[in-house]
């Protein structure tokens, strides 16, 4: 993708985007947040001036500021990060600095939301670019999941069976919105990472007859296959088709 070598200001737009390298087939949510164009004083500043302004701000704020940088960020961002890692690691890092009043998460929506969930009420979490979305997290939104849940409830029922097993246990991947994580919490479900997906599915099947896994169909399918569950028992619900 030629966009990977273009200057960052090329993507300074109010139009939501997954950025350079993203698949043209990825659907952006209609209600995706829009980023305001940055003031000219930043756009016209040299790289050296911008770097100095960041360094000065860090020095001035000291321990009150925590900058988290995802692995995918450019080097000129990573150099200022207090912690660098994947989304799960950075979410844990956010809890290690309760003295930080301001957490700047250089990542995408769901990452900043997760840090906000784990932070204290006194801390603020800032996402520098509001249009920084994740196509994986956007593969399922709360309205789609709720519709699927309601339809499955009509088919499978909503009451536990005679053994006390729930009809369906919702499981969401870490790369999902706060709304989906909250949905799982309300409905007896759980959040998983790629490394503990197997253990989480074992936990879920010990408590329920079925699992509704979202938004990453491949993580759910591959983990279930490794557990010996046949593909014939893994239907895919498509929100863009009647009755899924």
At which residue positions do the language-model features occur?
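The feature marks the mature, well-folded catalytic cores of soluble enzymes
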Residues: 3-244
